Regions:
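Oxyanion-binding/catalytic loops of NTP- or PPi-dependent enzymes
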Residues: 1-297
Length: 297
């Protein structure tokens, strides 16, 4: 929502749909918003917590290692950090002719690796394919098609890459809005949102709604066909894309006789197995001593 505010989406025409494409250094998020009657509503969100600019940097590092006969195992932490920094510079400063030029010293000798634009696009194909999954998921959750999106805005430093901008343009069949520095969009939007909360006259007031980006729930034990208890199951309580703030109630029961303590393991994620989701923390509650299933929380 902060990025959407920074781009002034709340000042657009009613019944307009937007997609915020946020690709940072280590994570990727996509949000679909709709504006109507001065209400900017987040319709759906999706993302990949393990996809970002660092993955593109890794491709350049790997190509440099391959070309100059280096391996991770043969390098010190200082050397690996040095090569990553040089690769990051190469990624951020692609030449006008489309080359990614990484220059660095190997055994005291200055060498370079040149990666043509076409070759880098091919190297990045799997990463770009991973971008499509959250985009499709968010469109499906919002019940809209790509052609029904009126405007696409870019957020996050990695969207500065010509490769990414070209890919987004092809994906939606339109040139994305890059009028604001993607590194500053969220901070700028947060400042405007703060002004709205303070009811500053210079800022148009708009109602903002947001959604829960991941399903929230807890780990539970369930009975198997053999009447045995099996742990590691995830019980959703607040589903992904629920408008927030929100509250839900779910009842749970003790699982064995004379149980006096219950540990609530809170997680976020979409897997039915607790171990595949992200742990947010635990709560320990004391319950009365009783038979299994007699006490509930």
């Amino acid at each position: 929502t902060a990025a959407a505010i920074a781009y002034g989406l709340y000042q657009k025409n009613d019944n307009t749909r937007f997609l915020v494409f946020d690709l940072g250094g280590g994570t990727f998020d996509v949000s679909i918003l709709e504006l109507f009657d001065d209400i900017l509503e987040v319709r759906a969100v999706a993302g990949d917590n393990y996809l970002g600019g660092e993955d593109f940097t890794n491709l350049i590092v790997e190509e440099f290692y391959k070309e100059h006969g280096l391996t991770e195992e043969s390098l010190s932490l200082k050397e690996k950090s040095y090569y990553r920094n040089q690769a990051e510079k190469s990624k951020c400063n692609a030449t006008e002719d489309g080359f990614y030029r990484m220059q660095a010293a190997v055994n005291g000798e200055k060498v370079e690796t040149l990666i043509p634009r076409g070759a880098f696009e091919k190297m990045s194909s799997q990463l770009l394919d991973r971008i499509k999954t959250p985009v499709r998921k968010s469109l499906s959750d919002a019940g809209v098609k790509a052609r029904e999106i009126d405007e696409v805005v870019l957020v996050g430093g990695t969207t500065k890459m010509p490769l990414v901008r070209k890919f987004v343009g092809k994906l939606f069949g339109r040139v994305p809005d890059t009028s604001i520095n993607p590194d500053e969009a969220v901070a700028l939007g947060a400042a405007i949102q703060a002004a709205m909360k303070e009811r500053k006259e210079a800022v148009k007031e708009v109602i903002l709604t947001d959604v829960c980006p991941f399903t929230l729930g807890t780990e539970v034990s369930v009975k198997t066909e053999n009447d045995h208890l099996e742990g590691n199951h995830f019980c959703p309580i607040i589903e992904r894309n629920t408008v927030i703030p929100a509250s839900r109630t779910q009842h749970f029961f003790t699982v064995y006789d004379h149980q006096t303590q219950v540990e609530i393991h809170i997680l976020q994620g979409e897997s039915r197995f607790a171990s595949n989701n992200v742990s947010l923390g635990t709560l320990k509650l004391t319950v009365p001593d009783n038979e299994a299933g007699k006490e509930q929380i």
